[in-house]
């Protein structure tokens, strides 16, 4: 005898009618059990020698919100240069090899900009978006979220030294 098809909506209604009731406001909007949110934004270009463009660099603010036990702070803000991201990637690859996690692949960073217009607003914003996507990809990996000391230091330490 064929079973009657029930759409998801009718199944949901039958569950709710069996004493489960409507979910409360706090259940709907409660903090997730474990979360890690990372944003790379607010790029700033620095001219260390006053008006001389030699030595100019751009850094980016990384904001992290988390309740994961491997992190020491629930909210952290740090500023990082592109070279810091490069060093972080190298340290992360080394940590992964030492922990023998062959299935963790660290993606490549967005390409280094060698053009003379690397400090234009459009180029800086394109890089920021690339670094944001890259950082979310790396931080979104479950093994790295729960076990990477290098990731925690990069996100939380005022100065990243590996």
From Swiss-Prot:
Domain PX, first and last residues per copy: 38-161
Which organism does this record belong to?
Saccharomyces cerevisiae (strain ATCC 204508 / S288c) (Baker's yeast)
Q: What phylogenetic lineage does the species belong to?
A: Eukaryota, Fungi, Dikarya, Ascomycota, Saccharomycotina
Q: Where in the cell is it found?
A: Cytoplasm; Golgi apparatus membrane; Prevacuolar compartment membrane
Residues recorded as binding a 1,2-diacyl-sn-glycero-3-phospho-(1D-myo-inositol-3-phosphate), renumbered to this chain, are: 81, 83, 112, 127
The protein depicted here goes by the name: Sorting nexin-3
Task: Report the sequence similarity comment from the record.
Answer: Belongs to the sorting nexin family.
Give me the ranges of the annotated region Disordered: 1-23
List keywords of the entry alphabetically. Cytoplasm, Golgi apparatus, Lipid-binding, Membrane, Protein transport, Transport
SUPFAM superfamilies recorded? PX domain (SSF64268)
């Amino acid at each position: 005898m064929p079973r009657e098809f029930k759409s998801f909506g009718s199944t949901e209604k039958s569950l709710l009618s069996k004493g489960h009731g409507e979910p409360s406001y706090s259940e709907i909007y409660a903090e997730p059990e474990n979360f890690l949110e990372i944003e790379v934004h607010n790029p700033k270009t620095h001219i260390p020698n006053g008006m001389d463009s030699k030595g100019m660099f751009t850094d980016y603010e990384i904001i992290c919100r988390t309740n994961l036990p491997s992190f020491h702070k629930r909210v952290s803000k740090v500023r990082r240069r592109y070279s810091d991201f490069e060093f972080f990637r190298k340290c992360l690859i080394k940590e992964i090899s030492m922990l023998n996690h062959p299935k963790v692949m660290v993606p490549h960073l967005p390409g280094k900009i060698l053009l003379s217009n690397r400090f234009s607003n459009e180029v800086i914003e394109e890089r920021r978006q690339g670094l944001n996507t890259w950082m979310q990809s790396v931080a979104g990996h479950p093994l790295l979220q729960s076990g990477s000391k290098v990731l925690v230091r990069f996100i939380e330490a005022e100065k990243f030294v590996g």
